[in-house]
Amino acid sequence: MKMKAKWLPIAAAVTAALASQAAFAVDFHGYFRSGVGVSGDGDMVKYNVNKVGRLGNENDTYGEVQLGQEVFNKDGKTFYVDSMFAMASNGSNDWEGTGTVCNFDAKQCSGDSDFALRQFNVQAKGLLGFAPEATLWAGKRYYQRHDIHISDFYYWNISGAGAGIEGIQAGPGKISFAWIRNDRSAKDVFGEYTNTGTSAAPNYVKNEDLNVNTLDLRYAGIPLWSEASLEVGAMYALVNETEAQKPLKNNNMKDGVMLTAELTQGILGGFNKTVLQYGTEGYSKTMAFYGDGSWYGAEAKDGADGFRIINWGVVPMGNNFEMGHQLVYGVGNEMWDGNDKFETMSAVVRPMYKWDDFNKTIFEGGYFKDKNKSTNGTTEDDSGYKLTLAQAWSAGSSFWARPEIRVFASYLANDEDKKVFESGTSKDTYQVGVQAEAWW
């Protein structure tokens, strides 16, 4: 009995330590995709993924590692620190880093791999007396991103460094407000360099990037009819040029507004989303070029505007079939001198047949068409398509089940007889490969 009593304080201390660790456990999340493949001319290509779909159309290795922890919890007040690092490469070698040589291979690998800090922020709850349920946050983060998975198309997303209040209960829905920085490169707006000298004695000075701040207001979770909800939002981009940039400023560098309404309808255990978006000034380019709001085209011509209609979803079709789809139509008007109207349309379908809980066959077909009409009446068209057949093994039968390993074959073609493949020698190509994808 004395021996048992002797060890009781130690056991109590160990138990307390373990309980403390459990209470403040590190949350580990992530995403990755990687594989190997070949095309009709060397390694694989990536062709208009947002427009024709991503299955069998990705030639990279990409990964995200997210670590977060609740570091304080007392009297209903919590503080959470979140972080994420990302890596992107072409997957061409065993060792891929920021160096210039791959191991002992003479192949130069400068820029072979990129590393980025994607998130680092603090999220606090219970601090606001008027809204204890809301989250007060600051730092760099992914912010309420809306995307279509089958095409990797983010259509509503202002992620970046900023601050905000998220999830204030207001009637049936919740209000969120954020201020996020999304600068535009000097090269896109007024040129990378400015000549402060003369033509005879030039003196080129490198221009700074244009500071752009975005104010974002959203009202989400508005209930409508059965299994239907609505989310609406407004973004306002403020152009904030420096004194040195004011002489370079022209009428084109204007503030802009982006409005979004998203209707979500539950269907047979799946869902369908219809999205309406309208943008002015720099957001006209968001509508035309598959943007998401995280970049602002401040160089757009004064008075430019655009709109976009999106329909997408994933719906079960019986016990063994599921179907994912995307339909997009976007327009940008008078975005630069000589531009009258830019139209884009795309459609992607991804039906899937489940053989059992771990084995599935997937088809993905996508088509797009772009039309750029000039003020002189001429038009320039571009269109293309992709067809992919894949056999996949995944951790479950769901459309969203991951990890997944897939073997695929794809055919890609330009529909305007433009030789955009195989080093500019062919209007089409094929590619075959194996890819793994996971999120957790």
Swiss-Prot record:
Residues 1-25 form the signal peptide. The keyword Transport applies. The gene is lamB. It catalyses: beta-maltose(in) = beta-maltose(out). Belongs to the porin LamB (TC 1.B.3) family. GO terms for molecular function: maltodextrin transmembrane transporter activity; maltose transporting porin activity. It is a multi-pass membrane protein. It holds the Pfam family LamB. This is Maltoporin. Keywords: Cell outer membrane, Ion transport, Membrane, Porin, Signal, Sugar transport, Transmembrane, Transmembrane beta strand, Transport. It comes from the Bacteria. The record marks 31, 62, 95, 271, 400, 439 as: Greasy slide, important in sugar transport. Involved in the transport of maltose and maltodextrins.
